[in-house]
From Swiss-Prot:
Keyword Membrane recorded: yes
Catalytic activity: Na(+)(in) + 2 H(+)(out) = Na(+)(out) + 2 H(+)(in)
Protein name stated in the entry: Na(+)/H(+) antiporter NhaA
Family assignment from sequence similarity: Belongs to the NhaA Na(+)/H(+) (TC 2.A.33) antiporter family.
Molecular-function GO term, any one: sodium:proton antiporter activity
Statement: the UniProt record of this protein carries the keyword Secreted: no
Any GO BP annotation: regulation of pH
UniProt organism field: Paramagnetospirillum magneticum (strain ATCC 700264 / AMB-1)
The protein's role, per its UniProt record: Na(+)/H(+) antiporter that extrudes sodium in exchange for external protons.
Predominant cellular place of this UniProt entry's protein: membrane
Coiled-coil stretches: none
UniProt subcellular location: Cell inner membrane
GO cellular component: plasma membrane
Pfam families cross-referenced by the UniProt entry: Na_H_antiport_1
Amino acid sequence: MAAEKPSSIFRDFLDSEAAGGVILMVTAALALVIANSPLSGAYFAFLQAKFLGMSVLHGINDGLMAVFFLLVGLEIKREVLGGQLSNWSQRILPGLAALGGMVVPALVFLALNAKSPETVRGWAVPTATDIAFALGVLALLGPRVPASLKIFLTALAIIDDLGAVLVIALFYTAKLSWPALVAVAAILALLAALNRLRVRSLWPYLLVGAGLWGAMLQSGVHATVAGIALALTIPMGDEQHSPLHRLEHGLAPWVGYGIVPIFGFANAGVSFAGLEPSRVLQSLPLGIALGLLFGKQIGVFGTAWMAIWLGFAARPEGAGTAQLYGVAVLCGIGFTMSLFIGALAFGELPASSDAVKVGVLAGSALSAILGSLVLLRCRSSSS
């Protein structure tokens, strides 16, 4: 029986994520060039400039990225309720692969950093997959990669994003403010009431959601979690013009072509001036790079292969084992989410932040190159 074709919404999502990934590559490369040019002083000064009481970098990471997480939440809700993750048979393979792809990189990192109190808090940095970057690489490879593997990678990355949100909420939360948390709970109750009352206009949700972000910012829980929480309250119906679909389609180009590239430009810049090989081989950048390059592929491919071998899940249609491995390697492109978690873990420590960037850039770049080489040498098992 032929596999079910992805919906037009899902195809649009794949296309926008892939195009956004290519733009992200360009802006990240531009940030590296500027950070190592005579313009580096102006670049870093601009990121630390104050605006409305916070630095530009802080505003991007806490403000714009909340919109990114809002889109992530909308995608998760859509896929779980009516898309590629709407039943258990569709969830098993990407779900198990995502779990393996989070656990093994963390173990690789901890193997090198467990005895270092200064660096151990970065254990979650190599557990992430950048869906835009990975799909951008697949887009450059053209039709040699089966659509089923693109859907598998997208579903895995969406589950991975959900895991990252849980990690941020549970392990990277500052000192809690109980009055602010009470305000968060009250605002969430109001959003839930709007949903129960079947309010279909987006403006009430967005206005109340802005208040949720402000309360979350004061609560000690990272403000980007507000984006996920807001997304869960946006109504989704069967029709194409439901509030969730309208908001997702409205946000997708702004996030893919604007917010994510801006984040990459602001966070990928690291100066290599005076960077010695001994610093690159320290446990923090090495643990991140090896976690992304080896931990991800071992965790994703090993878990997926075992699930298929044991009969728990079916191999993506038209995909060979080598192609599945190639996509597993691409999951080591952590970039956006890895840099974001690294900023949460070491944001106040410039030296550690630079080490994180070096590890993320090295692990992500090597994963992209190796994964591409594997897939370039593969042919579909059906051909």
